[in-house]
């Protein structure tokens, strides 16, 4: 419990840190059972509340410590804080909490989670997504790590490969925690569209925040249109397909990744 409310720290298994993606995916199968078990429901509420708290510490971070303990990656060249385990910017880190909170609300009818901490979190999510559209410069995020593994750091002085602002959202890293090659990660942009629309429904029905809800739906529509225009590729054998990554300049990376979201797994996240 934290301030009289459920608080659940879900560590990823082999590392005592809480990834926003992993924690959301780990408890997802239990949501459908929440109405049958009060303790299970309380655990799920605690995960959601902890995720909102984490986002409000730093929306660019992917993994968090259980308190300001510091960790292995405090020497990374980015804006590290002792509460952060790792600060790799991944779009899906902000989508999984929205997906979990929405489904929990739909199953249980419990809207108490959508309080002031939620409002701060969704505001931070919107701000971060818009910053990483990079329409007004490169934004505040940079990341470099002293490593022999190229996929664990970003080139271009910590900014990653250049992109052309076209309405898509940059993801510096993939759900695998590997750096993107071209920074418009297509499956994660689809996840952002779906998650923003879920957030808009919550803001409209629970918080009566129609203006903020419209910001969510407008951004979702912009990203969706950009995906249709810039993320497709005319394959000589298979016709029009979605690329895995693009950069807005016309370059496409044709592959898929094992983690979720991926192109093959879009249906698993209800897209």
Task: Describe the role of every protein-language-model region.
Residues 1-21:
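Low-complexity, Ser/Thr/Pro/Gly-enriched N-terminal "stalk/linker" regions
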Residues 5-10, 70-88, 150-184, 247-252:
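Acidic/His metal-coordination segments adjacent to aromatic residues that form catalytic metal sites
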Residues 16-44, 48-151:
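Aromatic-rich carbohydrate-recognition surfaces in CAZymes
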Residues 33-38, 104-117, 179, 183, ...:
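Inter-helical turn/loop segments and adjacent helix faces that build the functional surface
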Residues 187-203, 224, 263:
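A conserved active-site cap/scaffold subdomain adjacent to cofactor or substrate pockets
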Residues 207-251:
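Acidic, glycine-rich loop-and-beta core segments that form the ion-binding/anion-interacting portion
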Residues 247-265:
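Active-site loop ensemble at the mouth of alpha/beta enzyme cores that anchors a bound cofactor
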Residues 269-271:
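Conserved small/polar residues in nucleotide/adenosyl-binding loops
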């Amino acid at each position: 419990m934290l301030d009289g409310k459920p608080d659940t720290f879900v560590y990823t298994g082999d590392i005592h840190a809480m990834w926003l993606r992993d924690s959301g995916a780990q408890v997802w199968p239990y949501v459908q059972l929440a109405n049958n078990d009060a303790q299970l429901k309380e655990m799920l509420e605690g995960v959601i509340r902890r995720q909102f708290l984490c986002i409000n510490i730093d929306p660019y971070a992917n993994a968090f410590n259980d308190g300001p303990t510091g960790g292995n990656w405090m020497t990374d060249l980015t804006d590290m804080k002792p509460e952060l385990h790792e600060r790799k910017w991944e779009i899906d880190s902000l989508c999984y909490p929205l997906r979990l909170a929405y489904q929990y609300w739909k199953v249980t009818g419990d809207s108490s989670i959508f309080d002031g901490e939620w409002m701060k979190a969704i505001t931070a999510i919107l701000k971060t997504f818009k910053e990483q559209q990079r329409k007004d410069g490169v934004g505040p995020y940079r990341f470099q790590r002293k490593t022999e593994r190229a996929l664990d750091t970003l080139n271009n002085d910590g900014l990653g490969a250049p992109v052309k602002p076209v309405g898509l959202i940059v993801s510096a890293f993939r759900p695998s925690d590997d750096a993107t090659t071209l920074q418009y990660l297509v499956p994660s942009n689809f996840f952002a569209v779906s998650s923003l629309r879920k957030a808009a429904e919550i803001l409209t029905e629970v918080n009566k925040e129609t203006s903020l809800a419209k910001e969510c739906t407008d951004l979702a529509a912009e990203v969706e249109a950009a995906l249709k225009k810039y993320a497709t590729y005319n394959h000589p054998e298979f016709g029009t397909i979605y690329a895995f990554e693009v950069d807005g300049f016309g370059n496409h990376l044709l592959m898929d990744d094992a983690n979720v979201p991926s192109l093959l797994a879009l249906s698993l996240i209800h897209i």
